[in-house]
Regions:
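C-terminal output helix
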Residues: 80-82, 96, 100-110
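Short hydrophobic/Thr-rich beta-strand motif most characteristic of the beta2 strand and flanking loop
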Residues: 25-36, 40
Length: 112
């Protein structure tokens, strides 16, 4: 069962994403910030990291370096072509805009 780390500061979004992924046979861990993720988990051990772009403290793109090769999917409500391109240039494997459609998220996760 693939193990996914969700890093999202909005509890409602984090919980909804967790439920969606768990219903679809993914094992899920979660954190509210990059710092919390670093303190609680070995980030490179995850099969996928799904992170909000704008987080308290460090941006979600910091997880790209910390993941040491584990794929990182960036999601944000600040959906712009520039944000998407910048995230991908930094090494994100994909980018998804919030609010996201459940099927769209599941397809993105399955692709990775």
């Amino acid at each position: 069962m693939p193990h996914i780390l969700i890093v999202e500061d909005e509890t409602i979004i984090r919980s909804a994403l967790r439920r969606l992924l768990e219903r679809n046979q993914y094992q899920v861990s979660e954190a509210g910030s990059v710092q919390e993720a670093q303190e609680r988990f070995s980030i490179p051990s995850f099969d996928l990291v799904v992170s909000d772009l704008r987080l308290p403290g460090a941006p979600g793109t910091e997880l790209i370096k910390l993941a040491q090769g584990a794929p990182v999917l960036i999601m944000t409500s600040y959906a712009s072509l520039r944000s998407a391109v910048d995230s991908m240039k930094m090494g994100a494997v994909d980018y998804i805009a919030k609010p996201f459609d459940h099927d769209e998220m599941l397809q993105a996760v399955a692709r990775i």
